Amino acid sequence: MSQLTHINAAGEAHMVDVSAKAETVREARAEAFVTMRSETLAMIVDGKHHKGDVFATARIAGIQAAKRTWELIPLCHPLLLSKVEIQLQAEPEYNRVRIESLCRLTGKTGVEMEALTAASVAALTIYDMCKAVQKDMVIGPVRLLAKSGGKSGDFKVDAHD
């Protein structure tokens, strides 16, 4: 098992020094789900929400969240992201919305936390916009789907998970 990089020998949390690392293209994808009643999903898909376009708002929120991850998660580095993409898809057969985020940069540290934050905040935004209609929506699971670049190598979720 790998060592925790954010904990020093004394057991104290610290920000990892990435100054000696090589700049490489880094990419990460994450997903999140929001499960709801079929009527709530239909309202979103049909564009009948009185607050406006739920998907467009969630997309912008996810992009903003990726760019501000370093302000939310204490030991994350501020990153110069070159791409953030948020895809939202209604899955009526499961009464849910699937959110997939993609973050990319050329840099010295990965973008996994940015991708996870983007997907999570997009899901939270859907909940926020629809909570007046349904309070018992469920957010989750949220997970990393894939990452590439960097010293630790590539990762991809098993297709059967």
From Swiss-Prot:
The residues that hold substrate are: L75, C76, H77, M113, E114
- Enzyme Commission numbers on file: 4.6.1.17
Q: Name one GO molecular function term.
A: cyclic pyranopterin monophosphate synthase activity
Q: Which reaction does it catalyse?
A: (8S)-3',8-cyclo-7,8-dihydroguanosine 5'-triphosphate = cyclic pyranopterin phosphate + diphosphate
User: What CDD domains does its record include?
Assistant: MoaC_PE
Pfam families this protein is in? MoaC (PF01967)
What are the BP-aspect GO terms? Mo-molybdopterin cofactor biosynthetic process
Q: Does the keyword Ribonucleoprotein apply?
A: no
InterPro entries the UniProt entry points to? MoaC, MoaC_bact/euk, MoaC_sf, MoCo_biosynth_MoaA/MoaC, Mopterin_CF_biosynth-C_dom
Pathways involved: Cofactor biosynthesis; molybdopterin biosynthesis
Record's keyword terms, sorted: Lyase, Molybdenum cofactor biosynthesis
Top-level taxon in the UniProt lineage: Bacteria
Q: Which Gene3D superfamilies match?
A: Molybdopterin cofactor biosynthesis C (MoaC) domain (3.30.70.640)
Active site, per annotation: D128
What is the annotated role of this protein in its UniProt record? Catalyzes the conversion of (8S)-3',8-cyclo-7,8-dihydroguanosine 5'-triphosphate to cyclic pyranopterin monophosphate (cPMP).
On assembly, the entry states: Homohexamer; trimer of dimers.
Per the similarity annotation, which family is this? Belongs to the MoaC family.
Protein name, as recorded: Cyclic pyranopterin monophosphate synthase
| Gene that encodes it | moaC
